[in-house]
Amino acid sequence: MAKEKERIKVVSDNRQARFLYEILETYEAGIELQGTEVKSIRAGKVNLRDGFALLRDGEVWLMNVHISPYDKSSLFFNHDPRRTRRLLMHNWEIRKLIGQVEQKGLTLVPLKMYFKGSWVKVALGLGKGKKLHDKRETLKRRQDDRDMARAMKR
C-alpha cells in the first residue's frame, strides 16, 4: 500500500531568522518534549524568535525557545517555559553539523516548528550572520519586488 501523504501543520514560524541570517541549509529534527509542552504547542503558544541550537557531547540542544505553560494544567505539573530541549537527529547529520559549525563558524537557528502527523518537528537552518549592509540590501530588494508586482498588476 502506498504511504499516505503526511499532513504538516505549521505552529510557529521564525521570520526574523531569515532576515538576520543567510540560511545555507535546512534540517528537520524531532524534539523531546513533556506532555504539557505538546498541549501548549497545539494551542500555538510558541515563540522561536530568540532561539538557537547548540552542539554538546554529540547531541543537539534547542536553547531559549519559549513554550508557554499550559493554562489548563496546575502549576505543579507544568513545565519551565525556557528549558533546554534535546533535538533528535541521525548521528551522521549531527557529525556533519559539528564539522560545519566548528570549522566555518556557522549558527543553527530554528526556522519553524510544525506537526508532521502527530509528531512535533523543528526545521533548523544552518546560517551565517548578515552584516548591516546585507540587511539593507535585502530590504531594498524586497521593496523593488513589491513595486514590480504592483506595476505588473496594472
Swiss-Prot record:
Entry function: Required for rescue of stalled ribosomes mediated by trans-translation. Binds to transfer-messenger RNA (tmRNA), required for stable association of tmRNA with ribosomes. tmRNA and SmpB together mimic tRNA shape, replacing the anticodon stem-loop with SmpB. tmRNA is encoded by the ssrA gene; the 2 termini fold to resemble tRNA(Ala) and it encodes a 'tag peptide', a short internal open reading frame. During trans-translation Ala-aminoacylated tmRNA acts like a tRNA, entering the A-site of stalled ribosomes, displacing the stalled mRNA.
Short name of any one Pfam family annotated for the protein: SmpB
Q: Which organism is it from?
A: Synechocystis sp. (strain ATCC 27184 / PCC 6803 / Kazusa)
GO CC term (a single one)? cytosol
Task: Write out the annotated subcellular location.
Answer: Cytoplasm
Q: Which family does it belong to?
A: Belongs to the SmpB family.
The entry's keywords: Cytoplasm, RNA-binding
Task: Report the domain of life of the source organism.
Answer: Bacteria
Provide the GO MF annotations for this entry: RNA binding
For this entry, list what GO says about its biological process. trans-translation
Name the record gives this protein: SsrA-binding protein
Gene3D superfamilies from the UniProt entry: 2.40.280.10
- Where does this protein chiefly localize? cytoplasm
